């Protein structure tokens, strides 16, 4: 079963989806998709909502909600590497590629970062270009900037 609920945040209303195994999707207002709404209570959704609320209040730096991400083995290795980027820090796509043992795979790594179904929770907003420029983000660059600023990372 897919559980679904929404959370009002400083960035707008996020749509959260979970299975019995874990959180499976976080969508920004510009990507709400079909069937946005509420379903029966689910402990994973409740935990994700509380952790996101604490994150936006500046009280949480590392998420612990169980995850149920669906993707290729390569994508999952990239997403796992993203969870190791510390709060308030940024890395390049090349850094992530090196972290998964594929140093010549910066471009495919970028594709996997862009396919991340769990933005914020799996912090793809902390990945920037090798030249320190901001690159695409599923919620839009303005939201990426807001998340980095929330974490104390000033972007010029």
Q: How would you describe each model-predicted region?
A:
Residues 112:
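Residues in the recognition helix of alpha-helical DNA-binding motifs
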Residues 121:
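Major-groove DNA-recognition helix of helix-turn-helix-type DNA-binding domains
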Residues 130-156:
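…primarily DNA-binding HTH/wHTH and HhH modules…
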Residues 106-109:
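Helix-turn-helix DNA-binding helix
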């Amino acid at each position: 079963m897919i559980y679904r609920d929404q959370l009002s945040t400083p960035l707008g209303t996020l749509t959260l989806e979970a299975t019995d195994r874990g959180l499976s999707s976080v969508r920004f207002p510009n990507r709400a998709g079909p069937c946005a709404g509420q379903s029966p209570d689910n402990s994973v959704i409740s935990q994700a909502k509380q952790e996101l609320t604490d994150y936006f209040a500046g009280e949480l730096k590392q998420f612990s909600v169980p995850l149920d991400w669906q993707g290729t083995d390569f994508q999952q290795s990239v997403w796992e590497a993203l969870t190791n980027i510390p709060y308030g820090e940024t890395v390049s796509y090349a850094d992530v590629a090196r972290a998964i043992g594929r140093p010549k795979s910066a471009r495919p790594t970028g594709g996997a970062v862009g396919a991340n179904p769990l933005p914020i929770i799996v912090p793809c907003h902390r990945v920037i270009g090798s030249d320190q420029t901001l690159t695409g983000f599923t919620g839009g660059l303005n939201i990426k900037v807001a998340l980095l600023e929330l974490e104390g990372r000033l972007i010029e």
